[in-house]
Curated annotation (Swiss-Prot):
The gene is purM. Belongs to the AIR synthase family. SUPFAM superfamilies: PurM C-terminal domain-like, PurM N-terminal domain-like. GO terms for molecular function: ATP binding; phosphoribosylamine-glycine ligase activity; phosphoribosylformylglycinamidine cyclo-ligase activity. It is found in: Cytoplasm. Its EC number is 6.3.3.1. PANTHER family: TRIFUNCTIONAL PURINE BIOSYNTHETIC PROTEIN ADENOSINE-3, TRIFUNCTIONAL PURINE BIOSYNTHETIC PROTEIN ADENOSINE-3-RELATED. GO terms for cellular component: cytosol. GO terms for biological process: 'de novo' IMP biosynthetic process; adenine biosynthetic process. The keyword Nucleotide-binding applies. It comes from Cupriavidus pinatubonensis (strain JMP 134 / LMG 1197) (Cupriavidus necator (strain JMP 134)). This is Phosphoribosylformylglycinamidine cyclo-ligase.
Length: 350
């Protein structure tokens, strides 16, 4: 195009294309104090550089790095609908740090990816403040991230999230389930709600039942129960691991109880869970009744009140329960490990 064809016209800018660099800079300034509160030993350089640096502690003799990545799923659609963005950041952190925790890893640092069509600084800052809160609960550093403003890629007011956690475990202390044997005890730690899984079904139930999400629900608004942030189990379980032998752990996420517990079991074993060992929390009772959801479907979609499973030897069970209760966790003995019969499922709820 010749210079004369644009005479008298202002040149185009990135802002004209839908990307506001100034808003991105303002967001970085807003979130730096949040990230600073998460800093821990090992962080050499955090937010602002091209790459974040982390020095692994010399306390490890044979360190093994453990990584995990996840998102928040369609729980975000409810966040948009309700215009509340204060809990999904913690959800994002929890999904990854709880995953790497089950192998005995201490989460060291976390990075986030926030993508949107048009950047709303207040919304993004609220989300990232929640991410920082989750990192504090997990004891890991929010060491970096990416904010991607991509015009026309997302509807106005919507965004997507992804998170990445890296932790470390001593090689000889990796928890992989290989020592699990028949007779071991299955403990269940309470969830805070539906956590971050099954929300496509939650949203469908809401669509069909048309409840008042601001109505009182056992002392809180129904929307508060539905949007409760995912519980982070890192500190109490790292403490337990240092106290007694933990044979296996399972983070109860997508797939519920019946599809996550088998992921840590030897092929010749099955976990038999007693459905009356813990009370089904009110939120799940409501979801089941409003959606007329079958028991088996509940167990393979939702955590049903159990956010983390811990497997220990029978002789260690009572001590483990006392330790976790002292750390503030609600915990129950919910089942046992048995020898697996031919053709039997690896986890059954009876």
């Amino acid at each position: 195009m010749s210079a004369s064809s644009t005479a008298g016209q202002a040149g185009l800018s990135y802002r004209d294309a839908g990307v506001d660099i100034d808003a991105g800079d303002a967001l970085v300034d807003r979130i730096k104090p949040f990230a600073k509160r998460t800093m821990r030993e090992g962080v050499m350089a955090g937010i602002g550089g091209f790459g974040a640096l982390f020095e692994l502690s010399k306390k490890y003799q044979e360190p093994v790095l453990v990584s995990g990545t996840d998102g928040v799923g369609t729980k975000l659609k409810l966040a948009f609908q309700l215009n509340r963005h204060d809990t999904v950041g913690q959800d994002l952190v929890a999904m990854s740090v709880n995953d790497i925790l089950v192998q005995g890893a201490e989460p060291l640092f976390f990075l986030d990816y926030f993508a949107c069509g048009k950047l709303d600084v207040d919304t993004a800052a609220t989300v990232i403040q929640g991410i920082a809160r989750g990192c504090e609960l997990a004891g890991c550093a929010l060491i970096g991230g990416e904010t991607a403003e991509m015009p026309t890629m997302y509807p106005d007011g919507e965004y997507d999230l992804a998170g990445f956690a890296v932790g470390a475990v001593e090689k000889k202390k990796i928890i992989d389930g290989t020592t699990i044997t028949p007779g071991d005890v299955v403990l269940g730690l309470a969830s805070s709600g539906a956590h971050s899984n099954g929300y496509s079904l939650v949203r469908k139930i809401i669509e069909v039942a048309k409840p008042d999400l601001d109505a009182d629900f056992h002392g809180q608004r129904l929307q508060d129960a539905i949007m409760a942030p995912t519980r982070i189990y890192v500190k109490p379980l790292l403490s337990l691991i240092e106290t007694l032998p933990v044979k296996g752990m399972a983070h109860i996420t997508g797939g519920g109880l019946t599809e996550n517990v088998p992921r840590v079991l030897p092929q010749n074993t099955t976990a038999v869970l007693q459905r009356d060992a813990w009370a089904l929390p009110p939120l799940f009772q409501w979801l089941q009744s409003q959606g007329r959801v079958a028991d088996d479907e509940m167990h393979r979609v939702f955590n049903c009140g159990i956010g983390m499973v811990v497997i220990v030897a029978k002789e260690d069970a009572e001590r483990a329960i006392r330790h976790l209760q002292a750390a503030g966790e609600a915990v129950w003995e919910i089942g046992e490990i048995r020898e697996r019969a031919e053709g039997q499922a690896q986890t059954v709820v009876v």
